[in-house]
Amino acid sequence: MVVSVTPRHSTGGDGIRSVTVLGSTGSVGSNTVELIEAYPERYRTVALVARRNVAALAGQARRLRPEVAVVADEAHYADLKDALAGTGIAAAAGPAAVVEAAQRPADWVMAAIVGAAGLEPTLAAARRGAIVAFANKECLVCAGELLMAEVRRHGATLLPVDSEHSAIFQVFDPERRPAVSRLILTASGGPFRTWTRERMAAATPKEACAHPNWTMGAKISVDSASMMNKGLEIIEACHLFGMPDGQIDVLVHPQSVVHSMVEYVDGSVLAQLGTPDMRTPIAVALGWPDRIATPGARLDLIKSSRLEFEAPDPLRFPALRLARHALQCGGAAPTLLNAANEVAVQAFLEERIGFLDIERVVEATLASLPHSELNDLDDVRTADADARRFASEMVAAGRGSR
């Protein structure tokens, strides 16, 4: 299960929880910072990490007063240092500095760096037994067995921040896992839920990022449009909750009110409901094991009285099939899936390939590269690099488009 039996360092001796936010200027990170700011009596910031948005990072640092602010892109180090001059806040840059920030003693770490780049800092936080609020599903997809082994070995606490896995976490009883019949992940269906394949072939990045319910970053918005996001979440749920692929189902739920469900063997189905606001699952993790108030709108069941559910269409959205196939193949297959998808999504956002070309790049990568065993982090890095190289060459050669 996700949570360790006896989590370490839930708060400091003064009752204040020290926190680090990895990926602080992204969608999840910005919402996390907003909640931390709302409770200055509960939280003290140790480190803030961003990829390259120095202006936003410096603004957050001036408000939260962390020990250090880190920009992953070393080219922006001078700008960050200048922006923090006279504040007493240390500035750092580069991948090693990101990992060092995760290693700093903080009770709670938000792991919100997008993509495989978040793996090493997430592992670093887990290895010192921190509470890790986990918003980076790609880490579990790339290296789920390795990460979960480190969580168990070091007594870390892993709390899901994806709305679906947070929902399951809130209604899943780990003491009665044999009584769980299945997990049901809900999906909005994204902006292309009713589109034909022909229409999707001409979709623009702007259309793919226009999610009907959620406000998210570009990459996860495209993944939602292709339903690859839900495929990655199936793999994530297997690792987080110890459930096999055959006991994890997906239902399309256009209203995004029921965030996911757990069905028990007696026929009972427990669900978590709420408005589509990422601040809610973030607050669940930030306050755990307590609850903290959020400023978002409350669910009005009368106005939301119509709740619809439908099966996903595997012909229009083959990403679900590809993700399940990678999970069943095991070894490096999920790592290849994730890396190829990241490359293809970026190429689509840059208008170098079409929307349906994303799945073609991913499928070809899975079919062409070996699904080797992953015994350590070096194996993960090798598989990830091989998949990125293959997918990038496919995009560059125009073989990803049709």
Curated annotation (Swiss-Prot):
Any matching Pfam family: DXP_reductoisom
Domain of life, per lineage: Bacteria
Recorded metabolic or biological pathway in which this protein acts: Isoprenoid biosynthesis; isopentenyl diphosphate biosynthesis via DXP pathway; isopentenyl diphosphate from 1-deoxy-D-xylulose 5-phosphate: step 1/6
Annotated Mn(2+) binding sites: 162, 164, 233
Gene Ontology BP terms: isopentenyl diphosphate biosynthetic process, methylerythritol 4-phosphate pathway involved in terpenoid biosynthetic process
Gene Ontology MF terms in the entry: 1-deoxy-D-xylulose-5-phosphate reductoisomerase activity; manganese ion binding; NADPH binding
SUPFAM superfamilies: 1-deoxy-D-xylulose-5-phosphate reductoisomerase, C-terminal domain (SSF69055), Glyceraldehyde-3-phosphate dehydrogenase-like, C-terminal domain (SSF55347), NAD(P)-binding Rossmann-fold domains (SSF51735)
Function (record text): Catalyzes the NADPH-dependent rearrangement and reduction of 1-deoxy-D-xylulose-5-phosphate (DXP) to 2-C-methyl-D-erythritol 4-phosphate (MEP).
PANTHER family tied to this protein: 1-DEOXY-D-XYLULOSE 5-PHOSPHATE REDUCTOISOMERASE, 1-DEOXY-D-XYLULOSE 5-PHOSPHATE REDUCTOISOMERASE, CHLOROPLASTIC
Family indicated by similarity: Belongs to the DXR family.
HAMAP family listed in its UniProt record: DXP_reductoisom (MF_00183)
Designated name of the protein: 1-deoxy-D-xylulose 5-phosphate reductoisomerase
Species for this entry: Rhodospirillum centenum (strain ATCC 51521 / SW)
